[in-house]
Amino acid sequence: KFQSKNFKNWSNSDLKNIPVDGKRYNSYEFMEKEWEYMWPKVWLLLGREEEIPNAGDYQMEDFGKESFLMVRQDDGSIKSFYNVCQHRGARLTFNDLGTTETFNCPYHGWKWRKDGKLIEAQDSEDFPQGDPCQNLRLEEVKTETFAGFIWINMDRDACSLKEWLGPIWDEWQAYEIHKWKRYVAQTVNMPCNWKIILDNFNESYHLNTVHAPEKAVTKKRMPSGVDTSYKSTQFDLSDEGHNRMIMQAGYGPAASFEEGGVIEDPLATVMRDWEIDPNNFTGRGFDTREAIQKAKRKLGPKRGYTHYENLHDEQLTDAFHYTLFPNFAVSLCCLLYTSPSPRDATLSRMPSS
C-alpha cells in the first residue's frame, strides 16, 4: 500500500464497515432529518471573494430550501443574510450577482441597507409597535472567508471554520488558493440525491472503467498519468469527517520504456512544458515523475509559480483529491458542491467551477 513520504495519514484511520440503507438516497423523511439535524449546523462553501470585490457588491446563492445574500461591506468584510424580507417573507432579489446600497422588497417596498439594517418602511408611523426601522435587521448568517471562498453557517454557535476544516486548513494555505481565478462555471440539475454525486468523487473504484485510457497499454493508469490503483493511492479520513486521496502521477507505463516504446500524450506534453524532451528521455517509466518534480522546482519560480516553495515534491506531480463534509469536493482543479432539492430527495443541483 502506498504511503506518502511527506503526508502522514490523518488521525482517524478507524474506518468501520457500516451498511447504508438505500432509503437515505430517496426518502423524503430522511431528507427532512438532514434539514433538521445537519444542514443548519455545517459550514457551507457558497461564494468566491473575487466575485464581490467592492463595497455594495453581492452574490446570491440558493441552497436547497434556503437562499442567501453575501454582501461586501464598506470595511472590506463580508456579511451574509437570508435572502428574505423580514416583513412578510418576500424574496429580496433573484439576481446571482449585483451591486447595491439597499435591497428593496418588491412587495411592500421596505429598504434594507447592505449591512442589513432597515432604513425605510412605508407608513412607518402606523405600526402600533413602533417604527420598524428602529429595531429590525435582516437575519444574518455566520460568515467566514478562507482560501478566497465565502463560507456560511446557519448555526450562530457553530465552531470556527478553521476548527471545522481541521488538517485541510494548513494544507490548502500552501497552494495559495485565494489567488485562483474562475474561468468556467456551470450548474447541472441532477436526477439523483445529492449524496450520490459526492459518493462518486469520494472513491476511485470507478476510474478504471469510466476513465480508462483509449489504448489499453497499461494496467491501471489514466491518460493523465495518474495511477489509479488502490495500491498506489493513500486514503485518509480526518476526525472532522473530511476525506483525502493522494494518487501518484507524472509517469507512464514502465514497460513501454523497457521495450523501446515512446512516451505518449498527455505525459509527453507535460514533459515538454517543463523542458524535458520525451523522445530522448532515458530511464524507467517511474523516473519521469521525479524528472518533472525537479524541472518544476527549477523553472517554476521563474514562471511565476512562487508558491512551489511551499509545496512538497509530491504536490508538484501527484493528484490530491479532497472531499469536505458534507457536500464539497476538489478534484485536481475542478471544484464542485452539491445542493439538495427543496422538496424531492431524488433530485439535486451541482454547481461547479
Where are these predicted regions, by residue range?
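Short, contiguous pre-domain boundary segments
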Residues: 7-21
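Rossmann-like dinucleotide-binding core of oxidoreductases
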Residues: 123-132, 136-138, 142-238
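Non-catalytic accessory segments flanking enzyme active sites
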Residues: 18-69
